[in-house]
């Protein structure tokens, strides 16, 4: 299990170890251009490619993207089917590129409602990139933060645990192998976390932008990281307890 971000004060002006993003605004991007919603999802995939490349080059260790929530199954069936097909085709065409760039791919979520073909493709993609030690790209699909916590608690019940600690829950979450996100980004103008990594975001720095996801690029990512650098991350401490180079007045 990876120690959480809240357990230690990170060093100064380095890129965040772990960035988590809610990629919001694909549908509105398409609507503004009088295009079908699916056109926004297609363009959103281009933004994913650019952000993954930028994170790799900046030295970010973990990038987690919220692609499809447990609540998204309520969307029109035509759109859901398109998103599942887009995910399948992205796995087919992008995994070799990820592998060649030493990127490890992981998929976080239930998978119970995925087709057998999609589940098999995910398994193959994870296996192919499992030995890579560069950027870890996690796609959260059919994922919800409440589901994650309940799943962890049910595992503890099945183990016969009578007293449950925070560490026990953390160890059984879907991303127990990764540090907690240092920086959370949401595009599209909404200011909520929408059932994404509820446990893990406890001490993350939150950054919201009005940019729609298809318009989010390297420059926008750099702006978010610059904002992150201006924050004073105390994790319950006082400013005076922080190393001098991490105090807000020294940033």
Curated annotation (Swiss-Prot):
Primary role: Catalyzes the condensation of isopentenyl diphosphate (IPP) with allylic pyrophosphates generating different type of terpenoids.
CC terms in the record's Gene Ontology section: cytosol
Entries under NCBIfam families matching the protein: PRK14830.1, uppS
Co-factor remark: Binds 2 magnesium ions per subunit.
Organism taxonomic ancestry: Bacteria, Pseudomonadati, Pseudomonadota, Betaproteobacteria, Neisseriales
E.C. number: 2.5.1.-
Active site: 24, 72 (proton acceptor)
Domain of life: Bacteria
Keyword Aminoacyl-tRNA synthetase: no
Keyword annotations: Magnesium, Metal-binding, Transferase
Residue stretches spanning the membrane: none
Source organism of this protein record: Chromobacterium violaceum (strain ATCC 12472 / DSM 30191 / JCM 1249 / CCUG 213 / NBRC 12614 / NCIMB 9131 / NCTC 9757 / MK)
Cofactor: Mg(2+)
GO terms for MF: ditrans,polycis-undecaprenyl-diphosphate synthase [(2E,6E)-farnesyl-diphosphate specific] activity; magnesium ion binding
Protein name per the record: Isoprenyl transferase
């Amino acid at each position: 299990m990876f120690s959480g971000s809240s357990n230690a004060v990170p060093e100064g002006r380095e890129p965040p170890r772990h960035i988590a993003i809610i990629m919001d605004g694909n549908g509105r991007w398409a609507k503004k251009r009088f295009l079908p919603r699916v056109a926004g999802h297609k363009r959103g995939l281009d933004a994913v490619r650019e952000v993954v490349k930028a994170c790799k080059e900046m030295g970010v260790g973990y990038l987690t993207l919220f692609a499809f929530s447990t609540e998204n199954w309520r969307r029109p069936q035509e759109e859901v089917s398109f998103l599942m097909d887009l995910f399948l085709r992205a796995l087919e065409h992008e995994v070799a590129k990820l592998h060649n760039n030493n990127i490890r791919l992981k998929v976080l979520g239930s998978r119970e409602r995925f087709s057998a073909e999609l589940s098999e493709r995910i398994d193959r993609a994870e296996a192919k990139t499992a030995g890579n030690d560069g950027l870890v790209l996690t796609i959260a699909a059919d994922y919800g933060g409440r589901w994650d916590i309940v799943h962890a608690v049910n595992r503890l019940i099945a183990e016969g645990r009578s007293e449950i600690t925070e560490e026990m829950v953390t160890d059984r979450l879907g991303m127990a192998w990764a540090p907690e996100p240092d920086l959370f980004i949401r595009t599209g103008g909404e200011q909520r976390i929408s059932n994404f990594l509820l446990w893990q975001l406890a001490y993350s720095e939150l950054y919201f932008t009005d940019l729609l996801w298809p318009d989010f690029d390297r420059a926008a990512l750099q702006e978010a990281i610059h904002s992150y650098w201006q924050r004073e991350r105390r994790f319950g401490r006082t400013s005076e307890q922080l190393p001098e180079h991490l105090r807000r007045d020294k940033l």
